């Protein structure tokens, strides 16, 4: 598809974005650059999405990022995105550069208890799964 085939309002919006001095392009992971699949550990990114993010990250004054509810280490291992693409995990509390907010032991314990309770509910309902994030 060429730019001329895009609706006029989309072309105007793109022209406006292209004039900003610094651009952040951020995308969700699951259901956006990777398909929703029945086994979350197999949600690999689509090649076209990786190529687009890599190209965007290579542009001057442009940062490309992927944000996910997944833990940062899981997002990095599963996505295998190039280092030029910034990764942000745990709904924004973990970054691959700059800083990371560690989850304290009380919060980890609470998360374990919540996961256990939800897993019991899921076990009683066919087709329901719980993914620890």
Place the predicted regions along the sequence by residue.
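Non-catalytic pre-domain segments flanking phosphatase-related domains
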Residues: 1-29, 33-37
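Active-site phosphate-binding/coordination module
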Residues: 44-133
